[in-house]
Amino acid sequence: MVKLTKRIGGLVLRLAAFGAALAALIVMITSRERASFFAVSLEAKYTDMAAFKYFVIANAVVSVYSFLVLFLPKESLLWKFVVVLDLVMTMLLTSSLSAALAVAQVGKKGNANAGWLPICGQVPKFCDQITGALIAGFVALVLYVLLLLYSLHSVVDPFLLQKS
């Protein structure tokens, strides 16, 4: 019964992490807004910034990985490798979220020293969508940290309890 509960707990965590990464991916991909000022037209989309593209690619990789691991049998010998891949996915989410947050902050506040003006006043819907994607990405990251701890406990704990 305990093993079944642990398996279901891990499955729920993986499913939630998959959903959060997929939500971050979809919201970021659909973020776009066009604004016109007098004769000047401005279109904001995620492909304008390399950090947002990296965020999309990272969340796509994590989503595919999360989906595939859902179907891995519990008796598989690959679970030790899954712990390593969980760590890689956690670091991938961390780096992509950090880069996207930095760019989003510049978009929102600007950077007076570099002469970059904030754009969120002109394209608020775009900025709101980016914020939503970043929130979903942060949720995915937190779930992956929990999943990593859970995976480490599941794989390492049996070795610690064995008698020599």
UniProtKB/Swiss-Prot annotation:
- Asked whether the keyword Magnesium is assigned, the reply is no
Q: How does the UniProt record describe the way this protein sits in the membrane?
A: Multi-pass membrane protein
According to the record, the signal peptide region is none
Q: Name one GO cellular component term.
A: plasma membrane
* Presence of keyword Transmembrane: yes
Which top-level group of life is the source organism from?
A: Eukaryota
Sorted UniProt keywords: Cell membrane, Membrane, Transmembrane, Transmembrane helix
InterPro entries named among the record's database cross-references: CASP/CASPL, CASP_dom, CASPL
Chain ranges sitting on the Extracellular side read: 29-51, 102-129
Question: Which stretches face the Cytoplasmic side?
Answer: 1-7, 73-80, 151-164
Localized where?
Cell membrane
Q: Where are the transmembrane segments?
A: 8-28, 52-72, 81-101, 130-150
User: What quaternary structure, including any partners, is listed in this protein's UniProt entry?
Assistant: Homodimer and heterodimers.
| Family, per entry | Belongs to the Casparian strip membrane proteins (CASP) family.
Identify this protein by name. Answer: CASP-like protein 1C1
What species is this protein from? Arabidopsis lyrata subsp. lyrata (Lyre-leaved rock-cress)
Q: What is the lineage of its organism?
A: Eukaryota, Viridiplantae, Streptophyta, Embryophyta, Tracheophyta
